[in-house]
Amino acid sequence: MGQRDILRFREELASLVLKMRSKGIDDVRFFAAFEKIPRQHFVSSPWFDSAYDNKVIPIECGEYIERLEEQLLILSALSLKKKYRVLEIGTGSGFCTALMACLSDRVTTVDRYKTLVELARQKFQTLGIENIVVRRIDGSRIVTDLGSFDRILIWPSRSDEPKEFLELLAENGILIQAIGPDEGVQMVTRYTRIGSRFECSEMFQVRYQPFIEGIAEVL
């Protein structure tokens, strides 16, 4: 990457930080992590120049990276702290995984695609991030053997409340997932565990892919 590219990415990053602050995100730790993790490291070469654009970017295995502003709003809503254990369903490019790792104690991330899991591991190793556990499993099924978590982020959408995953939350834990019809508009929803009950708040509308059951046999 040339000096011109570096300067351009820095300008785009600074502009985005100002924009997100106008949306209510004003966490110094959050922006420090965002500046530390180069998003262009997580996109393929044809999309390198679009790394900081607010648009969907295709990745391997027919998957995609969500719009950048959506990613940042969701991660900010998790209110991550250094002591937290985080579970992510849907590793994807690994960009959000890396960001969360900078802001928490440990991130366990799972994906159904071997290719995405292996690529993510390589990227984390290159960046020197050591507090991420990457597993290739069927994320649509509850992973009780992993224990409880302070934060859970589920990228695939679903049509109903994620009750089985909510039970994995520790006290005062937060889970975020898009809830709504597979083929329609969904609502990114934030659940907070308070004792034996869960408070629910709606964030914004999206169109995310639903869960695909099973582990990919080829990719």
Protein language model regions, located:
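Class I SAM-dependent transferase core
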Residues: 1-88, 95-99, 103, 116-130, ...
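Conserved nucleotide-cofactor-binding alpha/beta core module
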Residues: 79-199
